């Protein structure tokens, strides 16, 4: 699997319409950027309790999802921006159904590994000034995902995102999200057991699987 990168993006602290600060708005870079253990150089996180760190170093939110959002939000001006949902990588031809936890991708000189789905938060609704967006993501599974950085390196727009190793797991980002974040997600005991012990899945999501398994009496 090889997909072309339309843009690499970083965010700075800025005021949201409600007056609170966030770095969710990501803007395309004009040249190469170093991708380190904590993400792209210059990319900031204001809410470090819920964002950032090695397991959430690089975020990809599929730009193709913006078309679905237009059906819900209309022609919202933010939907023209590839970084509107906080993503660092803009691609069209890739989504949560095609990417599996633990898969590794080469991006320029950097090596990335899929670590977890992205859990939506209210910052999205505050940025767009629209209620119901978090619930829509939870129901639809259009969540995006995070990479951890296995090997640091430089990349730029126009490079390709190339899958270089199979995770050995058939579990897609969407499957994890729908099982553990979707309110209607069924408590499949076998899947919960698998997720609870899947080493390449970020610890926070393994803990979600353990908790759901306990609630289900497993």
Please tell me what each predicted stretch does.
Residues 161-165:
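Short hydrophobic beta/alpha edge segments that flank linear recognition/processing sites
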Residues 91, 98, 144-151:
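Short alpha-helix capping/helix-loop boundary micro-motifs
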